[in-house]
């Protein structure tokens, strides 16, 4: 049975990805951070192949603890999906002084440094997996060239997601020669899932709709695995 660890799995895209991979017969390890959400526990009660791990991607100690638990549970991992993210305050920019640089740092810790820590900590298990696939959820706001007309954007999320893309590029340089394959995905503007399972009215897409697309992209082989590209929910490539 193939296995995957998914971060930020409490709700939204992460939860939808858990459901998708469970439906495809995978063993799923789900990183849980939000105590006020019990949607993962509801899923675990229906499927014994879902295992919940306490996991704060912004904490090196939490990642190390999760890796230790996983090493006692499974001998290998086939796929890692780095989905957890922190948006940061929307008014954090030079347009709304004083700028909260601590908020910028918190977003960097989760969105850019967290995925690098995840790969480093879970690499021994991934080395023993058959697929060796690393998947990262990024964003259109990570594209530096495309942000030139969006001067009022808050700083934390775009800056940290652009940094994530660079980190993925450096990981690709090192790990592609070791038979690792990579996926970088822009999911679009998704509705927020509430603790009771309902969806917010704002945003465009149901996370279950995007989750099905993302799961196919993450699981299936590409024609050219050597190229590192960022792909959106329509299959279009984005510059980064």
Region annotations inferred by a language model:
Residues 10-20:
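N-terminal Rossmann NAD(P)H-binding glycine-rich loop of SDR-like oxidoreductase domains
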Residues 86-90, 94-108, 116-117, 127-176:
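Catalytic loop of short-chain dehydrogenase/reductase
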Residues 44-61:
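Rossmann-fold cofactor-recognition segment
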Residues 6-7, 82-83, 133-139, 181-186:
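Structural signature of the Rossmann-like NAD(P)-dependent dehydrogenase/reductase core
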Residues 58-73:
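Conserved Rossmann-fold cofactor-binding substructure of NAD(P)-dependent oxidoreductases
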Residues 177, 184-187, 192, 196-240:
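C-terminal helical subdomain
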Residues 24-40:
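Conserved glycine-rich Rossmann-like NAD(P)H-binding loop of the short-chain dehydrogenase/reductase
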